[in-house]
């Protein structure tokens, strides 16, 4: 079971419940899963959901997706091995974003990691340009450039003149305060939008390590130039193929 809105979901659910069904597979998102559970609470029908929210599972509801806490643990463990220490995190300002923040901070505390800078965006109408500027602290670094140019203009040395020539070709002054950017968005279209815009505000994927959730584990991600050097959580491809072969048999 999975549909685009609550009304269609409930309509289809009541329809299938009239049949003699043994199991319900779906939906994907935890809010819809909770609706299905509520409607079927008086029926002994197991539910297998594709959500990654382990908080909703119980003795009748099985969660089949990758657990968020496992994704974050694996991604950060791998990142530590690559000697990445300073991270920016981009998440929606909602329950999902709060879960990501909580899991990252718990991992941070247990592993003595120093820097995680969180940027939250409005999940209902994200301003991708404004959020991308906030991630890179663009306005402050732009002001730093203007300040540095004024400072050099007061000097009369050849060295200052040479530096001025270089600075006037730039948009900002100063390095980013993170080495890696973790993007846990609600859907892949948001990931695509951010990856297209972030480089314009100095978050260059050739210099900054992009890190993502299992949401990125789609063929579409391979077509996004901004994500070419990124890595993301995913099921083991060999085990997945074994499962698919068994399922087809």
Which role fits each region the language model picked out?
Residues 173:
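Glycine-rich, aromatic-lined ligand/substrate-binding cores of catalytic
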Residues 1-15, 71-74, 124-136, 159-167:
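Structural motif
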Residues 3-7, 29-33, 52-56, 70, ...:
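Solvent-exposed loop/turn segments at secondary-structure junctions
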Residues 1-4, 57-62, 109-134, 138-155:
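Short beta-strand elements in bilobed, periplasmic/extracellular small-molecule ligand-binding domains
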Residues 131, 136-150, 158-161, 176-180, ...:
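Extracellular/periplasmic periplasmic-binding protein-like sensory domains
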Residues 7-15, 34, 38, 73-77, ...:
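Solvent-exposed, polar/charged alpha-helical surfaces in well-ordered, non-transmembrane soluble domains
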Residues 16-23, 176-179:
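Short acidic/histidine-rich motifs immediately flanking catalytic phosphotransfer sites
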Residues 22-120:
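Extracytoplasmic ligand/sensor domains, especially the bilobed periplasmic-binding protein
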């Amino acid at each position: 079971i999975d549909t685009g809105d609550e009304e269609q979901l409930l309509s289809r659910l009541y329809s299938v419940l009239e049949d003699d069904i043994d199991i319900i597979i779906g939906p994907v998102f935890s809010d819809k899963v909770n609706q299905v559970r509520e409607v079927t609470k008086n029926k002994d029908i197991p539910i297998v959901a594709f959500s990654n929210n382990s908080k909703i599972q119980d003795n009748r509801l099985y969660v089949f997706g990758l657990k968020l806490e496992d994704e974050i643990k694996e991604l950060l463990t791998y990142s530590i091995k690559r000697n990445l220490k300073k991270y920016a995190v981009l998440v929606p300002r909602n329950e999902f974003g709060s879960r990501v923040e909580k899991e990252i901070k718990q991992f941070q505390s247990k592993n003595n990691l120093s820097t995680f800078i969180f940027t939250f965006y409005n999940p209902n109408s994200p301003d991708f340009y404004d959020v991308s500027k906030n991630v890179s602290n663009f306005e402050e670094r732009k002001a730093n450039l203007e300040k540095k140019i004024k400072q050099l203009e007061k000097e009369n040395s050849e060295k200052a003149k040479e530096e001025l020539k270089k600075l006037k070709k730039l948009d900002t002054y100063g390095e980013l305060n993170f080495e890696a950017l973790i993007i846990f968005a609600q859907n892949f279209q948001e990931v695509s939008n951010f990856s297209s815009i972030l480089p314009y505000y100095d978050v260059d994927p050739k210099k900054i390590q992009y890190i993502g959730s299992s949401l990125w584990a789609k063929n579409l991600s391979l077509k996004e130039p901004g994500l070419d050097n990124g890595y993301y959580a995913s099921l083991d491809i060999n085990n997945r193929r074994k499962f698919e072969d068994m399922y087809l048999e």
